[in-house]
C-alpha cells in the first residue's frame, strides 16, 4: 500500500515537472499592433451652398432648383468614382442673352439647357488640353448635346456652335467636383437648331493720324511772304529806269 502511494506521488510530481518545463520552453505569444482606424470619408461638396456664396450665380442656381437638376448634379458630385464638372454662367450672362431669348423655352428644354452646362466627369484645368484632342464631349443632357474644347496656352475655350466663350476663372476644383465660371450662356444646337445668326463684326479700330513734322500750308505761306515782298520790290526798282528811257525816246520823236 505504501509502495502504491509512493508511486502515485512520484507520478504526480513527474507530471508537474513536465508541465512546468513545457511552459518554460514555449515562446510567448506575439503582441499584435493595434489596427489603425479607417480614414474618414471625404466630406461631400454642397453645390447649392457653394453656388450661393462663390459668386454672382443666382440665376443659374434658380434654374438648377426650379428644374430639379440640382439633385442630379449633387448625386454625381457625391460619386467619387466619376465626379462632375460644371460650367456656371454669371448673372450678367443671362441678362445679356437676348437672341435667342430663354423665356420662350419649354420646361423640358430649360432642363436640357441646364444639363448642357455640366460634364459627368471631373476635369481639372490641365486635363482640358488632352480633352481638346478627343473631339466633341457629351454633356449631362445626352449624346446630341456636346461641347468642343480647345486649349490655347492654358486658356480653355468652349464652342457649342451657338456659343463661343472661355473659362474665365476656377470657382472650385477639388476631385470629384470642378466648378468653372464662363461669361456666356451655353446654347445647344439640339434646342436652337443650326440656323445660327451671324456674329456681329467687331467695331473698327479708331484711326489715329500720326503727327506730321512738315509745316502747314498757312505756315509755308507765312514763311514765304517776306521773300515774295522783297522780290517784288527789286523788280519795281529795276523797271523804273527802263520806263524813264522809253519815255525820253518817245519825246524826241514827237
UniProtKB/Swiss-Prot annotation:
Domain of life where this protein originates: Eukaryota
SMART domains assigned to the protein according to its UniProt record, in alphabetical order: FAS1
Glycosylation-annotated residues: 46, 78, 104, 130
Span list, region Disordered: 203-233
Keyword Cell membrane among UniProt keywords: yes
Proregion positions: 233-254
Mode of membrane association: Lipid-anchor; GPI-anchor
GO CC field: mitochondrion; plasma membrane; secretory vesicle; side of membrane
Skewed-composition ranges (Polar residues): 222-233
Lipid attachment, kind GPI-anchor amidated asparagine: 232
Predominant cellular place of this UniProt entry's protein: membrane
Keywords recorded for this protein, A-Z: Cell membrane, Glycoprotein, GPI-anchor, Lipoprotein, Membrane, Proteoglycan, Signal
Family recorded in the similarity comment: Belongs to the fasciclin-like AGP family.
Role summary: May be a cell surface adhesion protein.
Record-given protein name: Fasciclin-like arabinogalactan protein 7
Organism of provenance: Arabidopsis thaliana
Taxonomic lineage: Eukaryota, Viridiplantae, Streptophyta, Embryophyta, Tracheophyta
